[in-house]
């Protein structure tokens, strides 16, 4: 029996709509944060923000079209 599981990749965002910053965090920070929302793996992209792989569809990711970080669009 086959099962289709939808996953997505992207920048992890917090409740404020902002990307998770990683510039001053330890190397494993992003991988830990991504796995916390059931992502497969993650890394600190250009030492600025956490990028996650294979996250479930319910996990919030940053989108430039709907960016609401600190009330901005």
From Swiss-Prot:
Keyword annotations: Amidation, Disulfide bond, Ion channel impairing toxin, Neurotoxin, Secreted, Signal, Toxin, Voltage-gated sodium channel impairing toxin
Molecular functions per Gene Ontology: sodium channel inhibitor activity; toxin activity
For the biological process aspect of GO, one term held by this record is:
defense response
The record's Gene Ontology cellular component field reads: extracellular region
What the entry lists under SUPFAM superfamilies is as follows: Scorpion toxin-like
Q: Which residues form the LCN-type CS-alpha/beta domain?
A: 8-70
Residues annotated as signal peptide: 1-7
Question: Which InterPro entries does the record match to this protein?
Answer: LCN-type_CS_alpha_beta_dom (IPR044062), Scorpion_toxin-like (IPR003614), Scorpion_toxin-like_sf (IPR036574), Scorpion_toxinL (IPR018218), Scorpion_toxinL/defensin (IPR002061)
**What's the main place this protein lives?**
secreted
- Cell compartment(s), UniProt: Secreted
Disulfide linkages recorded for this protein, renumbered to the chain, are: 18-69, 22-44, 30-50, 34-52
Positions of post-translational Arginine amide modification: 70
What further note is attached to this protein's record? Negative results: does not affect the cardiac Nav1.5/SCN5A, the peripheral nerve channel Nav1.7/SCN9A, and the voltage-dependent potassium channel Kv1.5/KCNA5.
Free-text comment about domains: Has the structural arrangement of an alpha-helix connected to antiparallel beta-sheets by disulfide bonds (CS-alpha/beta).
Recorded protein name is Toxin Td5
Record the organism: Tityus discrepans
Taxonomic lineage from the root? Eukaryota, Metazoa, Ecdysozoa, Arthropoda, Chelicerata
């Amino acid at each position: 029996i086959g099962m289709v599981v939808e996953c997505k990749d992207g920048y992890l965002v917090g409740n404020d709509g902002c990307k998770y910053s990683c510039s001053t965090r330890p190397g494993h920070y992003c991988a830990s944060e991504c796995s916390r929302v059931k992502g497969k793996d993650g890394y600190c992209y250009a030492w600025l923000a956490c990028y996650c792989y294979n996250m479930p569809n319910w996990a919030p990711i940053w989108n430039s079209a709907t960016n609401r970080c600190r009330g901005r669009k």
